[in-house]
Amino acid sequence: MTEQRPLTIALVAGETSGDILGAGLIRALKERVPNARFVGVAGPRMQAEGCEAWYEMEELAVMGIVEVLGRLRRLLHIRADLTKRFGELKPDIFVGIDAPDFNITLEGNLKKQGIKTIHYVSPSVWAWRQKRVFKIGRATDLVLAFLPFEKAFYDKYNVPCRFIGHTMADAMPLDPDKNAARDVLGIPHDAHCLALLPGSRGAEVEMLSADFLKTAQLLRQTYPDLEIVVPLVNAKRREQFERIKAEVAPDLSVHLLDGMGREAMVASDAALLASGTAALECMLAKCPMVVGYRMKPFTFWLAKRLVKTDYVSLPNLLAGRELVKELLQEECEPQKLAAALLPLLANGKTSHAMHDTFRELHQQIRCNADEQAAQAVLELAQ
């Protein structure tokens, strides 16, 4: 670090989740080094914290193979330009936030030029395409990992990795207020309540909604007072879910919510959800759950051969055992889903034990991630 200029940190975030992480990291760094300079690819939150944006984050936020191919020339141009400009700027450190397909190659380019690099948020190398770990090891000086089993994986391959905890675990209380959440959603305190979360992608909602609704119908037979809340991520998914409901369960009364997934989880006695980040959030909300997931047969066949983990849901990966019931493919059908949910709705020994384990796991990954990340960046930069 030269005397005549402030600590200079280059960052690239490629989507909203990365923008949130980047903003938290910049905030924590500014507390320690008030005159630090931040520059790179940033979204609105990072820019609000003072990051100078050479490119808008939206330029990188492309989903799906067709969209990526359509934008490939532009993406390659941006990466080449950043390699050149960061090479000239010689920042004290580069932090690639998630977006591994874009960032890991960029990190490798910069490391060759003598710039220290950090990759913030491990891709799921522990689950599939494990050989990527070697490329990550060559490209980065340090990986910042949200979860302890990720660090254990990198340690096995001698790739420097630091477990910093999960920002979502920092943001959510250890003991959520169920009744307050019910008041917000208009759910009586004494009713049984089930949350249905059929996924955030169109393909998931299409595959899972009908069986999730049929499961709720079966549970209503045992619990006639059952309140059913269905948070949907946007208007498109809501429209899709309403169409499926009109065909499958037109008479089933449910509360459709725009967003509010977290409130729905906190308010509910049990949740039925697709896998993914929602399962982690549900664990942190202390809501007992069943994971139901189905994909096209060929995709599942392929996934079974590629995925190297025993479980699909993060609570089970964290616990190292089947804490949460996972019903996949042909197992994901109404009778089996309802049978797995019944003991959770009874709010007895099963759900209490699950709740206690969720709380222990929450404490394990609640480490003040923004502060930990900032500390790691400064240690490497100086």
From Swiss-Prot:
Coiled coil, from the record: none
GO cellular component, one term: membrane
Reactions performed catalytically: 2-N,3-O-bis[(3R)-3-hydroxytetradecanoyl]-alpha-D-glucosaminyl 1-phosphate + UDP-2-N,3-O-bis[(3R)-3-hydroxytetradecanoyl]-alpha-D-glucosamine = lipid A disaccharide (E. coli) + UDP + H(+); a lipid X + a UDP-2-N,3-O-bis[(3R)-3-hydroxyacyl]-alpha-D-glucosamine = a lipid A disaccharide + UDP + H(+)
Molecular function as annotated in GO: lipid-A-disaccharide synthase activity; phospholipid binding
Keyword Calcium listed: no
Example GO BP: lipid A biosynthetic process
InterPro entries noted in UniProt: Glyco_trans_19 (IPR003835)
Pathway: Glycolipid biosynthesis; lipid IV(A) biosynthesis; lipid IV(A) from (3R)-3-hydroxytetradecanoyl-[acyl-carrier-protein] and UDP-N-acetyl-alpha-D-glucosamine: step 5/6
Protein EC: 2.4.1.182
Alphabetic keyword roster: Glycosyltransferase, Lipid A biosynthesis, Lipid biosynthesis, Lipid metabolism, Transferase
Tree of life domain: Bacteria
HAMAP family linked to this entry: LpxB
Biological role: Condensation of UDP-2,3-diacylglucosamine and 2,3-diacylglucosamine-1-phosphate to form lipid A disaccharide, a precursor of lipid A, a phosphorylated glycolipid that anchors the lipopolysaccharide to the outer membrane of the cell.
Family membership noted in the UniProt record: Belongs to the LpxB family.
NCBIfam families, per the entry: lpxB
Name recorded for this polypeptide: Lipid-A-disaccharide synthase
Taxonomic placement: Bacteria, Pseudomonadati, Pseudomonadota, Gammaproteobacteria, Enterobacterales
